[in-house]
Amino acid sequence: MYSTVRTAVLDGISAIPVQVEVDISTGMPVFDMVGNLTSEVREAKERVKTALHSVGIVLPAKRITVNLSPANIKKTGTGFDLPIAVAILTAMGVIDADSIKDCTLAGELNLNGEILPVSGILPIVFDEYNKGIGKFIIPKQNENEGRLVCGAKIFGISHLNDVIAQFDEAAFTCQKTGMAHEVQMDEKYADFCDVNGQKFIKRACEVAAGGMHNILLVGPPGAGKTMIAERMPSILPPLSENERLELSKIYSICGLLDNDSSLRDNRPFRNPHYSVTQAALIGGGTRINPGEISLAHNGVLFLDELAEFKGGLLDLLRAPLEEHCIRLSRAGRNVTYPANFLLFGAMNPCSCGYYPDMQRCRCSEPTLRRYFDKVSQPIIDRI
């Protein structure tokens, strides 16, 4: 008995189609999974077996082989649980194979058969719909996110029993078609008009905002550097529709997209602490997730206390500042994320912060040089 179900794996902000193949044949009762899988995907075997048992499905005492194709692509994430379970049910004859034709599935299972939300639903639905796939079965909590793609037929489910009952009817239905692109205005910008005085600095910020130029403010504590930076997004041009979609994809991958049927319409403002790690700043980790520079895409990346960032960390921004993207490599995977941000740097004029007020500043000339040398010249050139 053979069956196949379509799903997808994320590659940057794009989705690559994956076929979940299941073969149930005579032999020793073994459950094998192959196809270049990470540990979290291999763990799906136990989740699927227990979830099926909890809904009253007894696996046959035969050899069950699950293959995630193509095998040259690393499979990551927990969204393969639902496709694997449905593929097994199809091979067993519980679900009609014709009912899941031209349908993409994604979702995580817990041990009692509930469907849990997964990250990255928006790029999966968007790319699969552009490839001609019109029907999608996804977790109920991700339903509104999937409906952001106009024309896509979304079926949100909360339990494995919903899948079995739906397909027993031998006809796929959805509640309604995809919704038009609405916008999300959940963040209210701090108003740039709140800045009093500072005529020269305000003019410099306006020029920087007009052309998405990087800017560095150097001044003593309490001069208003942070206040000005926080109000920078309010004078940036509005996001275009393509920019909203691209930004929403990034936030969907990170699980930060609000499930309220709307795309992000606000320019992001990211303010990482100077103790941030390399993976958190530029991206990385086991799944190679986007970092702060990608979350600041089409917005402002504010680096306060610029000279206090760990040695070499700022130099990692050289390529993104020029290429407006970041290329990450880990464990044989190469992922590219957008990173077109306005870098807003702020720092004190010296270690104590009061130079050139010689009545308060106690920094020597060598101390001043060492302080400014913490920010490399290539980074200064790009600002």
Task: Map each language-model feature to its residues.
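Peripheral, non-AAA+ core regions of ATP-driven protein-machinery
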Residues: 1-216, 220-226, 329
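A short beta-strand-to-loop transition that corresponds to the Sensor-1 phosphate-sensing loop
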Residues: 140, 304-306, 331-332, 345-350, ...
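Conserved alpha-helical scaffold flanking the Walker A/P-loop in AAA+ ATPase domains
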Residues: 204-208, 262-268, 278-301, 334
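Walker A/P-loop
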Residues: 210, 215-258, 323
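P-loop NTPase switch/communication element
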Residues: 235-283, 342, 350
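AAA+/SF3 P-loop NTPase mechanochemical coupling elements
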Residues: 269-270, 288-298, 328-349, 359, ...
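Conserved AAA+/SF3 P-loop NTPase catalytic/coupling segment centered on the Walker-B
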Residues: 273-277, 289-322, 354-357, 376-380
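Substrate-gripping "pore-loop 1 plus following alpha2 helix"
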Residues: 315-337, 356-374
